Amino acid sequence: MANVVILGAGLTGLSAAYHFEQAGFTDFEIFEMNEEAGGLLRSFMIDGFTFDYTGHLLHINDEYFASFINTITSLDAFIKVTRNTAIYSHDRFTDYPFQMNLFGLPYDVIYECIEGYVNRRAGLRTPKNFYEWVLKYFGAGMGKHFFFPYNSKILAYDMRKVLPSWTGRFVPKTNLEAVLKGAFEQKDTSNIGYNSQFFYPKTGGIQHLIKSLERATKAKPRLHHKVVEIDVKSKTITFANGATTRYESIISTLPLNELLTMVKGSSHRSYGAAAEKLLCNSVVNFNLGFNRPKLTDRHWTYYPEKQYPFYRMGFWHNINPTSVKPGHTAIYGELSYLGKNTSKTARTALVESAVAKALIVLGISEQEVVVRKDLHLAYAYVIYDAWREKHLENLLKNLAHDGILSTGRYGGWKYSSMQEAVIDGKIASENLLPKFWGAQTIKKQTPPTTVKQINAL
C-alpha cells in the first residue's frame, strides 16, 4: 500500500510524481491503463513519418515551467517557431487572427465585419453565452464570418449554450484602429495571441517531453491498470485486471465524468447523475504523408466554413522537417463531434469525407498518399456550459472531501495547455505533502532560465 496513488501517467500525473520526488517524498504509486505513459502526448513513428495526437505545440509563459523544461531536458532539444498561419474562407487565404486581418476578403464581407464591430453590443454588461460575448466584443459580422462557424465546428455544440469563460488568453481582443488597419492593408500580426511562438522537439515528436519526464522520475507507472472502482470507505481501488490497491489519498487525472462513475461508498450520492451532465466533444485526427516535396510554408490553416468537414489542417513538415522523410510532406487534419450524438458508422463516414476533401483542397491525388494514421481523441474539448459553471467547483470539493484530488485538463474538466498540466501536477503534490509531512513543502528550485531569456533565443 502507498499513501498516495496517482491515477493516469499523462503529463499531469507524471508531473505530480516528479514533484513528489523533488521534495523527497516517495510513498506513492502511479497507475496507467495503457501500454505506455503519455496519454495524448504520445507520438507515432511510421515509415519515416512522426505523428502526434494533433498539433501539440509547447507554449511557455511561466518562469517555473521554463525551469522545469530546462531541468528534465533542455531548450536546446526544441525548435523555437514563430507562427505562420492562415484562415481559408470565401475561396481565399487571409491572415490570423481574423479580427485583425480582414484584408483580402470580399468587400461586402469586410463592410459587414466593420459595420458589425462599430455597432457591436458593447453595452451588454455580462454576456450570457459565447454568442453574446462575440456580439459584445467583435460584432455580428465577425461572428457570422468566423467566430460562430469556426467555434461551432471545433466544439460541435450550440454557441448559445456555451459560456465565454473559456476564452481568456485564447481569443485575442481588438480595437477599432486595429480592425480598420487590418482591413485596408496586410499587417504582420504573427506576434498576436498566446500561440504566436511555440517550441517543438527536434526529434521524437511531442512524446520527447513525456520520455524526458519519465527519465527524470524514478518511480515507474504500473501499466495496463484500468480503474473500474474506487471505494472511498475502505480506501480501495479495483482495476479491470483484477488487481486491487489501498491508499490514503488519490491524485486522479482521469476524465472527471468517468471518475465520478467509479466512486463508491461516498456520502455524496449525486456523482453518477453529475457524470451524465459533464459534456466534452471528441476529435478525429487524420494524418497523411505525401510523396511530394512542397505543399505550403504555413504551420496550419483554419477552415471555418461548413463545406470543409475539418476545422483545422496543419503541416508537420513545416513544424519540424525531421517529422517526414526527405522529399516528403505530411499533414494533420482535425474534425470534432459530440460522442453521444454520433454513431461509429457516421464517424467513419465523416472522416472519409474529410480526408477526401483535404486531398482536393491540397490538390493531391490518392496515389501520392504514402502513409495514413487516424488517431481518435475520445476526450478533446470540454464544453463550458451552464451546468459545468454552476456545479464543477462543488464536485471537485466533494471529491477532495472523499480523499480524491481530481486535476489536469480532464480531471479538472477544463481547457488548458501542457504548461498548465505540469503546474497542475506540481500543485497537486504540494497540496498533499502537508498531510503526510506536516508543514514541510516541496524544495524550492532555482530557475536556470527565465521566460524573458527564452523569448530572446
Give a label for each model feature.
Residues 92, 109-110, 114-235, 246, ...:
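Active-site/ligand-binding neighborhood in enzyme catalytic cores
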Residues 2-30:
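N-terminal Rossmann-like FAD-binding beta1-loop-alpha1 element of flavoenzymes
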Residues 47-123:
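Dinucleotide-binding Rossmann-like beta1-alpha1 core, especially the glycine-rich loop
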Residues 247-249, 257-405, 416, 420-423, ...:
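C-terminal segments that line or cap access tunnels to active or ligand-binding sites in enzymes
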Residues 7, 31, 245-259:
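Short hydrophobic core segments
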Residues 410-432:
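A conserved FAD-binding loop/helix module that cradles the flavin
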Residues 374-376, 433-457:
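Active-site-proximal substrate-binding core of FAD-dependent oxidoreductases
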Residues 21-45:
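Glycine-rich FAD pyrophosphate-binding loop
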